[in-house]
Amino acid sequence: MTTVRQVYEAMQAIAPLELAEHWDNPGLLVDCGGQMHRVLAALDITPEVVEEAARKGCGLIVSHHPVIFDPLKKIGPQDVPFQLVQAGISAICMHTNLDAAEGGVNEVLAGIFDMKNMETFAEGCGRVGRIEPVTVPELAKKAQKELASRCNQPFNGPAVQVKFADTGKTVRRLAVISGAGGSLFEDAIAQGADCLLTGEANHHHAIDAKRLGLSLIAAGHYATEFPVTAAVAEKLRTAFPELEVLVSEDARDPYTYL
């Protein structure tokens, strides 16, 4: 059977640790050791995801967001790392290194929009390139449809909520950066983008981007990042044919949208 360490080595090849931001905490964050025959890929490690992994007999969860980020001062039954150890489940978390990696979060996101002549921006994290000419409302609708089809469906409300600030300019050059990337609009402008598609952007990001001639689409943190879980699962299946790799069905957007 496959060991946790073997999967960790494979994940380091997929998302090299040197690509991570200095403030980040990627890696093998919970190591219960041993061998396993089943792995769960998820965006976040929540109590629901730990329960799912235990129910499905997964000895390891591979996630995007680190289950330990800030230094731990105490730990108890309500804390996810405690729950993982109690269940004997290890956790490998690849965060900003997976954002920047080839075939990682942002290349998966770019691929959804058939991006051509792809380049990096935002210190290698984001992707920018050519797409078929499209209006911002049309692009926002496509984002909502395509991302929803790749995410776990919520119990109530729509799967994806998209908002946009439209300059009225046709989008031919698109920049994408998943998650909380709204503050990077000036980096997108510097790369000649007509529009930045990200997960989260605040009020002032939208005002300033539009004033500077850049349209902005915010399609949700969860929605812009969850699609990478299927890509990671497929890479692990290729690397370990004997390993059953599942994509979490209980990892959902924490928000409910009206």
Name every feature range the model reports, one short phrase each:
Residues 1-258:
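Hydrophobic structural segments
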